[in-house]
Amino acid sequence: NQCEGAYNEGGRGLSSVDVIPFGPDRFPVAMGTLKMLDCDAGHFYPSHEAIDMYHHYKEDIALFAEMGFKCYRLSIAWTRILPHGDDAEPNEEGLKFYESLFDECHKYGIEPLVTLCHFDTPIALIQKYGGWKDRRMVDAYTHYCEVLFRRFAGKVKYWLTFNEINMLLHMPFMGAGLLFEPGENVLQTKYQAAHHELVASAKAVQLAHRLMPGAMVGCMLAAGQYYPRTCAPADVQAAADADRDNYFFIDVQSRGEYPVWAKKKMERAGIQLRMEPGDEALLKEGMVDFISFSYYSSRCITVDKTLLDDADGNAVTGAARNPYLKASEWGWAIDPVGLRVTMNSLYDRYQKPLFVVENGLGAVDTVEPDGSIHDSYRIDYLRAHIEQMEKAIHEDGLPLMGYT
């Protein structure tokens, strides 16, 4: 749904991604501190047109085939299927669009990898329930999944339940449609919403296995190993803690239970999850089949607050610049070896197949008069990361399903 555009065509309803603007209001809206549940003329909304894949998917997929791609990762827009998020009957026009898209992929021998929810909580459900803070979102999501699984069984084998699910804790409106009232316990609300998404993910896995024998369902993490800024024990511990926090959701989705460290952390913070009878069994029975993740850079962390200002290579808030790495024009550390390190960390922790589903370089590109972009720097970036994946496969023996 990030690239298709056509946000108000084909019977599609409004979702959270449609009201997150470009510019200074982007992060306040994404974080739930600035309420915006509709569009206005004073903002530019990137999702409205995006790259207009909705109208150009056939030529786009033909170009994929020309490049030799064997997999296309895409997201289905929840509100293109269920405009209000929980409609009893799906939008047939939306189903036909994706059906045609999948057929086009298969025509060229390209396997679709489909994300079920990619930062697009239906606005109608945010207004009705408050987004994922409400348990009823689990039923709405499960209904949505069932519609897709029944319709696309045989066309889609690989599924992801939630895109970068760990971003819920950092950008809660973007990740879960959360808005906060004055005096609300924000941390309690975010972790409760997280529990609802984890339960929904487990239900989706079970449903997919029942309706589509042979299908594989994965989780999706915004990944990137944390390095200690120095070898000081406090920095080493800070890096270990940051990695563990980042793996919270995947611990539950891959191991089927809340880890002890997370329970202790919530206890210290006064967080009390409301769980229904059977939730723990459901999490155990709905574990994912593989681990997918995005990787753009590693992170560097220190307890020395004076170093946090020197962060031009910082891709996340509260990290320090790594003096051993170059940074992109956007300030993100370029670390191909970090991809291999991250892959090994994930496999050592979970012992499940891996899938790199996002990787790339942002840059200030120059568009030539003929429309071409001579981005040798991006080619170099991708080549270096692919070389590290090759080492992870052949030298480390990691089971890598794909790279897209």
Language model segments and positions:
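Catalytic domains of carbohydrate-active enzymes, especially glycoside hydrolases
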Residues: 52, 56-77, 111, 285-291
